[in-house]
């Protein structure tokens, strides 16, 4: 018996079928006094660079909630495995929970295989998870680490796309940080040179983006060591008071004084005794 096939072959190109629906919904919401939610602005500058022997990751430490600085010294460099770390930009809860989940899954993978996890494995786990949620997990990540195949550096976008580059930046201050990388990066840098370059890139994001600020954290990963430098530098130091700004009593002369007595008329008075028994 022949079966009727209901499968419809996919049509190429982008579909705009939902655009008219969204316009109708927006008009209905406007009539009822509702407003559609707007995109939430998040502020961060994270960056990474490949040097001769490993990876240097960097991040600022300012956490914002709208236009308010919620935390001046939060850590944005997350542990994935002993040889892999990840910087997170975007929604703080999403970056924290995503990196914790991938760190646990990567530890199970390492126990199963009996080998040190590779950076490409963490990258694949992260991109598959983020792509599954179609961008609703607001986590923009910079993944870096060193394994048996050498140092690797990835940028991972909230929708699941990834780039493998010798230097990457993410976050609202990424343009300023990328300008520093484009100007001063060179292959096979020494460790101190790479740390200085990443620090300058994060500082550029701090001074040119209101969503980034406070301190600069660095994480240096190589085959022989792991250095977590928190803080590496403090470009925004709080100023000190140069003196007291209080005037002594009697400094300002009183020219005139007028005292008006306050007249109160008692209309009703109730006395309630307290029970002390």
Swiss-Prot record:
EC id: 3.4.25.1
InterPro entries: Ntn_hydrolases_N, Pept_T1A_subB, Proteasome_bsu_C, Proteasome_bsu_CS, Proteasome_sua/b, Proteasome_suB-type
Induction of its expression: Up-regulated by the antioxidant dithiolethione (D3T) in colon (at protein level).
Source taxon at top rank: Eukaryota
Compartment list: Cytoplasm; Nucleus
Keyword Protease: yes
Residues cleaved off as propeptide: 1-43
UniProt GO cellular component terms: cilium; cytosol; nuclear body; nucleoplasm; proteasome core complex; proteasome core complex, beta-subunit complex
GO molecular function, one term: threonine-type endopeptidase activity
Protein name: Proteasome subunit beta type-7
Taxonomic lineage from the root: Eukaryota, Metazoa, Chordata, Craniata, Vertebrata
